[in-house]
Amino acid sequence: MRSLLFLVLISVCRADHLSDSYTPDQDRVIHIQAENGPRLLVEAEQAKVFSHRGGNVTLPCKFYRDPTAFGSGIHKIRIKWTKLTSDYLREVDVFVSMGYHKKTYGGYQGRVFLKGGSDNDASLIITDLTLEDYGRYKCEVIEGLEDDTAVVALELQGVVFPYFPRLGRYNLNFHEARQACLDQDAVIASFDQLYDAWRGGLDWCNAGWLSDGSVQYPITKPREPCGGQNTVPGVRNYGFWDKDKSRYDVFCFTSNFNGRFYYLIHPTKLTYDEAVQACLNDGAQIAKVGQIFAAWKLLGYDRCDAGWLADGSVRYPISRPRRRCSPTEAAVRFVGFPDKKHKLYGVYCFRAYN
């Protein structure tokens, strides 16, 4: 206790002495760098980038080194890009680079490479974007024992649409739901995509699977059959269900297409089989549900004629609401899944560009 008291007295005396002799010239800012502080910093200039299917995009990533920590740079810099799964439980390898050695993984082969705009540029360029490329990517830079990461979200311009098959509503387990979207030129939507669609006005009272395995539905106009009339608008969450046994609808996402979507002018109405053949005779294929939604949402396609689609449903897209043509709102109108032998409808075709 005596030693401690003695030290305190010395400190007070020293402080008094400094106070008496202080001048403004003695005011200094002292920067102290911790011995174990960060010596490698990775940053993304943008947390989110936007593109569309078939386009090219640059995922930004730069790193900054402390030259005093790494000396002459005998450690080779390793750059690794991975994609985070929607549930954040796994990382999927995309691209790795170390010096002259580079490796690309899976469906990214031939489509990704480093921008290399400067010595500290780890930005990744992805070409010919697919619907599956949507998501969050992690840029990791490693030098010696030091490493740091940054995350960039890749958003795709597109449209979310609810889907159920001819069997009716609530008939798809998770795996069937994912395949159903693929069959309609789409992918199963993420929560973020559904949330953005809800903010854009999507209102749908049937619960559907999302890519993370959750079951949700968007409500902009609360009403009794859809969660209650006195509830607030929002994306209703049923939670996570058994992917094999539980059955719901699905929310799909699609984007721009490289082709022409059109209503085939034909002298007569068609059965389903006649509709398929009519498109083939015109050098095209019968259109898919994802294609009619993309044409409607992204191209403003408008046609007040009900037509067959590939899944056996009959629909028509209205961008300009009017009397007898979806008078209350712009929408892709759903007629149903009629008997394929009924000769009552036209057909929508799709011709891909080479």
Swiss-Prot record:
A Pfam entry, by short name: Xlink
GO molecular function terms noted in the UniProt entry: hyaluronic acid binding; structural molecule activity
InterPro entries: C-type_lectin-like/link_sf, CTDL_fold, Hyaluronan_bind_Proteoglycan, Ig-like_dom, Ig-like_dom_sf, Ig-like_fold, Ig_sub, Ig_V-set
Keyword terms of this UniProt record: Disulfide bond, Extracellular matrix, Glycoprotein, Hyaluronic acid, Immunoglobulin domain, Repeat, Secreted
Propeptide feature: residues: 1-9
The keyword Disulfide bond is assigned to this record: yes
Disulfide links within the chain: C61-C139, C181-C252, C205-C226, C279-C349, C304-C325
GO biological-process terms attached to the record: cell adhesion; central nervous system development; skeletal system development
Chief site of localization: secreted
Keyword Cytoplasm: no
Location within or outside the cell: Secreted, Extracellular space, Extracellular matrix
Domain Link residue range list: 159-254, 259-351
CDD domains listed in its UniProt record: Ig_LP_like, Link_domain_HAPLN_module_1, Link_domain_HAPLN_module_2
GO cellular component: extracellular matrix; extracellular space; perineuronal net; synapse
Functional description taken from the UniProt entry: Stabilizes the aggregates of proteoglycan monomers with hyaluronic acid in the extracellular cartilage matrix.
Family to which the UniProt record says this protein belongs: Belongs to the HAPLN family.
Name under which the protein is recorded: Hyaluronan and proteoglycan link protein 1
Protein's organism: Rattus norvegicus
Gene: Hapln1
